[in-house]
Amino acid sequence: MNALDPDTLIHPDVATAIIHGRHGDPFSVLGIHTTREGVVLRSFQPEATSVVAINPESGQEIATLHRVHGDGIFAARLPGRTGYRLKIVTATGTDIIDDPYVFPNLLGDLDVYLLAEGRHEDLGRVLGAHVTTMHSPDGREVEGVRFAVWAPNATRASVIGSFNHWDGRCHPMRKRVEAGVWELFIPGLTAGTIYKYELLGPNGELLPLKADPVAWYAEIPPATASIVASPAPFQWTDEQWMQQRGRLQAADQPISIYEVHPTSWMPAKCGDWNTLADRLIPYVQSLGFTHVEFLPVMEHPFGGSWGYQPLGQFAPMARLGTPESFASLVNRLHEVGIGVILDWVPAHFPTDAHGLARFDGTALYEHEDPREGYHYDWNTYIYNLGRNEVRAFLISSAVHWLTYFHADALRVDAVASMLYRDYSRKHGEWIPNMYGGRENLESVSFLQHLSTVVKSRAPGAVLIAEESTAWPGVTRPAHEGGLGFDYKWNMGWMHDTLHYMQEDPVNRSWHHDQMTFGLVYAFSEKFVLPLSHDEVVHGKRSLLGRMPGDEWQRFANLRAYYGFMWTHPGKKLLFMGGEIAQEQEWSEGHGTDWYLLDRPNHQGVQRLVADLNMLYRAEPALYRKDCAWDGFSWLVIDDRTQSVFAYMRYGADSDAPVLVVCNLTPVPRHDYRIGVPQGGYWREILNTDAGIYGGSNTGNGGGRMADATPSHHHPASLQLTLPPLATIILKPES
């Protein structure tokens, strides 16, 4: 064949576009094509010295491709539309490959339709990189990796990696115009392949290389590339847990959460997900927590963000290992009956050039106007939740963690910043909604849709809101006009009660209402009481460090506070280190001071937390009616002079009631009369002043007999000794 055969020549402009990586439709040029004179095969191989089409079975030559352009375009006429492979000789050796440009469309019609509509709920399955097997035009099964990325305004998209010397000209992708998605199947690639996307913007400008927004696996920072994840499905053995998690996470069940930053919990001994599981799981079991909540495990470039500036919304952070080892951690927690909550950040994302920022040369994931699209507090971009494709991206991320990784709940971060357009903004720095108000209607719609999708796609999973304002109906169902969350962090309770506990006891009478005000609204939502990581950072000091007095009083205050918290309506959350009375505040580089457990006072607090969890789970009155007024009644609410609080907790009619009394001064109170609903013997089932916890062992000798003296609107009453800076808990013997 003549090398200058006009049938195989490419128009000079087309050749230039291919060679310079500026052609937006490579499938119209490369691969096999039928012309008026016959079948033509074209291939772009810039490093090749020769290219031969060979029979896939026998390896015999079908045709030699001739160089029709000096910079790497080869072409030949074939005898017909036959199957072939390419034998490529370069200066470094010979490779035999399947041609990526002979495979048909990869995404199905329904996926493309849902992508175009912005209504796809499982983008983790459709976009990104997936090891798969495709059928070649001649019917052979060809293994490789399917890539797909949403970049509607890009004029060219390519997959790059060491397999093509990071040359964006070698593997340009096909654009599915109707959905704005670029796709390509590259034969021969396998799990573990490191890759990025090279994009040209709307004006043909070369953009910063991009990590895959939907990658399931990524390099360890500061490296920024994505990695093709293993195709083998994880072998889950948590069926029993998954079937019952909906019941175990209901509002009438005990939920006690241990919040963990995975890389700093025990960094010297837990360097990966597997060793973390080895130590964390028995520890959490021994303390009696029902759930572990992880600060964001999604891949994030800056460790100092604690995960709250994620870019890999589908990838567990590689700092601790593979996606499979993270799945194993979840599975092992489930096997021993411990639920897994993941912090999840749909409010904003970092500005790193390799991430989502101006992904295709336009404000694709973010708003164009910084008054809507930039968060000045965190120097991050805000997701454009008015764009259906962005909503679908985040919805799919949530579904991904709850289904593929079996997470039981997502704690949605920074909800308040999503709900208000003027959140942390000065006058002139925000744009009102369509009605002139400050409410972010797009975010409201997104959160309602999120709750609806989660309930249908992940039965039994729950959503928890970190929401710090008085927005009504956060935990009301979406179909009733609420946001649809299952629980909400009670930030007001946390701020008020911590402020009270920080006061010297001599001043507490002036702040008495801070301990009682939370009950005014305690049943307006379904609440979690959070003593989270946010309360032990940035100069706030540790929980122990906030307590006033000498060493004995500081520990006693903390123990009494925990007793108050564990008996107060609402689910419980404690950040790691709180259970051992950490002395220093936390940072991601400091972690937990486990050496403190060599000291009796710290051992005592740890034992108290374990006993509180055990008691909480054993007494239905402490959880059955967490979200209902008839599960709680004040007995002593107004003794501000002595800083005493007393209340009853009730469960179902068949559940024994529980009496809680807090004395938050260092002065013991003797013969303190408190009314109770029935006579008989009331056993003291927990006393935070017990000697085993480091207290003074002041108490009631195991219990008290109620007499017939009416008090506090009850027919009987107890005369109790109230230990100093302590909470005592009693229940009727029969």
From Swiss-Prot:
GO terms for molecular function: 1,4-alpha-glucan branching enzyme activity; cation binding; hydrolase activity, hydrolyzing O-glycosyl compounds. Pathway: Glycan biosynthesis; glycogen biosynthesis. Monomer. Its EC number is 2.4.1.18. HAMAP family: GlgB. It holds the Pfam family Alpha-amylase. It comes from Granulibacter bethesdensis (strain ATCC BAA-1260 / CGDNIH1). The active site is at D413 (nucleophile), E466 (proton donor). InterPro entries: A-amylase/branching_C (IPR006048), Branching_enzy (IPR037439), GlgB (IPR006407), GlgB_N (IPR054169), GlgB_N_E_set_prok (IPR044143), Glyco_hydro_13_cat_dom (IPR006047), Glyco_hydro_13_N (IPR004193), Glyco_hydro_b (IPR013780). NCBIfam families: branching_enzym, PRK05402.1, PRK12313.1. This is 1,4-alpha-glucan branching enzyme GlgB. Gene3D superfamilies: Glycosidases, Golgi alpha-mannosidase II, Immunoglobulins. SUPFAM superfamilies: (Trans)glycosidases, E set domains, Glycosyl hydrolase domain.
